[in-house]
Amino acid sequence: MSLLSVYASPLDVRRAAHLLRRATFGASPERIREFVGLTAEAAAQRLLANTAAPPPPLDPTTRQTFVNLPFSNAEQGRWQNYVKGWWVARMQQAESAAIEKMTAFWQNHFVVSFA
């Protein structure tokens, strides 16, 4: 027996906007309209559907990834800045915003760093 009933009503504008405020970093009116009429389950599936691994961050000077390079104290600060910029760009993409918001939550929860 579940403690909560499944919310089966279609989302209206207010509920769709609330969901997207909570699950992403904000949404445009167009994005909110995409979720109006969906059930909560369908909306959650849409938010989490884009789970393919993103391309790794690139060094803007060489346009090559540095992910598999040996660790370098001299380069660490520069690489951290590239990763931060790459991550912010991922957060701004509507397709991946829910995944990145969850990543931000867990990154803060487990207090991880570049290491």
PLM regions with names:
Residues 15, 27-115:
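N-terminal accessory alpha/beta regions
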